[in-house]
């Protein structure tokens, strides 16, 4: 796709291996991962600064795992409230669904409240670790073009000056109104909700009760959410005929807040803003050297808090693949797996978010009556009720095609699903989360066995070239047995017995775990070599040192 570009030579030219348009959370996450992989990145943002008002309020365990992968989770956690429940209330205040999953299979609380601007700031400051990563604010993309080996962007600077960026790849993280997506003429099909909502953020929380409450009031549904650092968010449906200007008037604001506060005049307003809830999905996530991520690729209603988290999944999925391609360690075909893996799951999360919105504010009054009746019925069906309250209805990603080997496995297979992250014990005696051992790249994890056994030198070299770590998991009581040490293999103790249980459940011995922590393949020691060869070919990995391809590692 080529847009028209002027012939006048601009004053300033920038180069980078990857250009990212948009300094929101998805763009910042992409830049952090690529930065730690040594890739030169230029982030282009049309605003003068990061957005400093609260937007998304829910961050899940998968997103925290992405933060952990780029070394920022300890700075993010102080801006979160873990184990944040979501409670649906009838118009009379009865709680008919108390959703508070207490599982931590990925190492973190499954539902967390957070303050997005402060977490965005953590990611932005994280870029200072990488001298080859730069951000340009107050730059608007006016046009761009791509060839077989590069992308060129024309920018307009803060004082009207013209600049160009030449990059090998472009990632569009420029939001739901993405200029990049529109210029590429990629359809963005979906629906816009007929009703808007007004969001009101208040400092020094005047309510101060924990968790999130969604009141299914047919007159005016509303949401009340406790956020970190003493912030309270209220959301009220905007009724037909009302405008943002009208609702922002003091007497109307007082009327809204009187539904939820005894003294609506004693509040410290941070801001109010009217939102329209959209549910849209891009037809394609990639055209040649341009890729879409986050809201540029999909937008969804807020009711499951998955817009932000879906964007983080995009970034985590795409960043490691792009890093391998840019560094010459994999072919460009690897990037085709990004859409294969992410688009269907994004669609599932959109559908879930729309459904949750219908539970809160049914389009028809009779549907609300049916909802309330079903909520009573669930009390007599404990297994069904637990299914909802533990959020097992949330579509967990399971990739069935892409950068993995399914081998015809069904839904019960862990291939294409995220690997667990329990605590493990190091040989030093320190207890850490598993990802601290895995690092930022691939890991080949074996239960009770040395995963290098039976691999030839060429296979080991090929995978070490992309940073793989070989990890042997043993019962914690065996961690100090030095005779079992294998050169080049890290040993960890199974502190909580979770890894043994995982391998036993799936009747396997070795898991190949990708940088985004998804299982790419399973094997036993005698089949690992063949699996790695097949996976490398599917991912179009570059060939490693094969000089000793027939030499076995004992």
UniProtKB/Swiss-Prot annotation:
Assigned keywords, A-Z: Aromatic hydrocarbons catabolism, FAD, Flavoprotein, NAD, Oxidoreductase
Cofactor(s) required, per the database record: FAD
Pathway given in the UniProt record: Aromatic compound metabolism; 3-phenylpropanoate degradation
Binding positions (FAD): 17-46, 285-295
Catalytic activity: 3-(3-hydroxyphenyl)propanoate + NADH + O2 + H(+) = 3-(2,3-dihydroxyphenyl)propanoate + NAD(+) + H2O; (2E)-3-(3-hydroxyphenyl)prop-2-enoate + NADH + O2 + H(+) = (2E)-3-(2,3-dihydroxyphenyl)prop-2-enoate + NAD(+) + H2O
HAMAP family per record: MhpA
Family stated for the protein in its record: Belongs to the PheA/TfdB FAD monooxygenase family.
Protein name listed in UniProt: 3-(3-hydroxy-phenyl)propionate/3-hydroxycinnamic acid hydroxylase
Native source species: Klebsiella pneumoniae subsp. pneumoniae (strain ATCC 700721 / MGH 78578)
Gene that encodes the chain: mhpA
């Amino acid at each position: 796709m080529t847009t028209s570009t002027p012939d006048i030579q601009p004053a300033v030219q920038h180069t980078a291996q990857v250009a990212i348009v948009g300094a929101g959370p998805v763009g910042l996450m992409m830049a952090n991962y690529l930065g730690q992989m040594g890739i030169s990145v230029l982030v282009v943002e049309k605003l003068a600064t990061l957005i400093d008002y609260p937007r998304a309020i829910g961050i899940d365990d998968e997103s925290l795992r992405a933060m952990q992968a780029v070394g920022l989770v300890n700075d993010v956690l102080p801006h979160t409230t873990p184990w944040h429940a979501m409670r649906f209330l009838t118009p009379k205040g009865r709680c008919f669904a108390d959703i508070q999953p207490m599982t931590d299979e990925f190492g973190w609380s499954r539902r967390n409240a957070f303050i997005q601007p402060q977490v965005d700031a953590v990611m932005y400051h994280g870029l200072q670790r990488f001298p080859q990563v730069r951000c340009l604010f107050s730059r608007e993309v006016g046009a761009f073009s791509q060839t077989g080996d590069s992308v060129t962007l024309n920018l307009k600077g803060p004082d009207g000056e013209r600049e160009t960026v030449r990059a090998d790849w472009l990632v569009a993280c420029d939001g739901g109104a993405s200029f990049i997506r529109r210029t590429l003429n990629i359809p963005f099909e979906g629906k816009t909700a007929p009703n808007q909502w007004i969001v009101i953020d208040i400092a020094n929380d005047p309510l101060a009760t924990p968790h999130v409450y969604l009141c299914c009031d047919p007159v005016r549904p509303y949401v009340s959410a406790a956020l970190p650092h003493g912030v309270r968010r209220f959301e009220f449906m905007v009724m037909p005929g009302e405008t943002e200007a009208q609702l922002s008037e003091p007497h109307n604001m007082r009327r809204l807040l009187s539904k939820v506060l005894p003294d609506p005049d004693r509040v410290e307003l941070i801001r109010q803003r009217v939102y329209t809830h959209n549910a849209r999905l891009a037809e394609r996530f990639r055209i040649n050297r341009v890729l879409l991520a986050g809201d540029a690729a999909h937008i969804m209603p807020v009711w499951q808090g998955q817009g932000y988290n879906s964007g983080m999944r995009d970034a985590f999925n795409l960043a490691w693949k792009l890093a391998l391609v840019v560094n010459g360690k994999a072919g460009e075909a690897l990037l085709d797996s990004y859409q294969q893996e992410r688009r269907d799951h994004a669609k599932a999360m959109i559908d879930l978010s729309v459904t949750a919105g219908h539970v809160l504010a049914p389009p028809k009054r009779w549907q609300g009556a049916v909802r309330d009746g079903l909520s009573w019925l669930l009390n007599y069906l404990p297994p069904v009720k637990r299914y909802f309250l533990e959020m097992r209805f949330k579509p967990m990603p399971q990739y069935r095609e892409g950068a993995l080997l399914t081998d015809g496995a069904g839904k019960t297979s862990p291939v294409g699903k995220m690997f667990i992250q329990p605590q493990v014990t190091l040989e030093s005696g320190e207890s850490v989360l598993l990802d601290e051992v895995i690092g930022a790249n691939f890991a080949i994890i074996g239960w009770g066995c040395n995963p290098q056994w039976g691999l030839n030198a060429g296979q080991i070299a090929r995978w070490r070239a992309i940073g793989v770590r070989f990890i042997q998991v043993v019962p914690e009581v065996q961690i100090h047995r030095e005779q079992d040490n294998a050169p080049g293999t890290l040993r960890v103790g199974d502190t909580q017995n979770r890894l043994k249980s995982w391998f036993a459940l799936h009747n396997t011995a070795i898991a190949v775990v990708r940088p985004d922590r998804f299982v790419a393949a399973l094997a036993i020691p005698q089949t690992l070599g063949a699996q790695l060869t097949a996976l490398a070919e599917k991912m179009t990995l570059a060939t490693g040192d094969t000089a000793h391809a027939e030499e076995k590692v004992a």
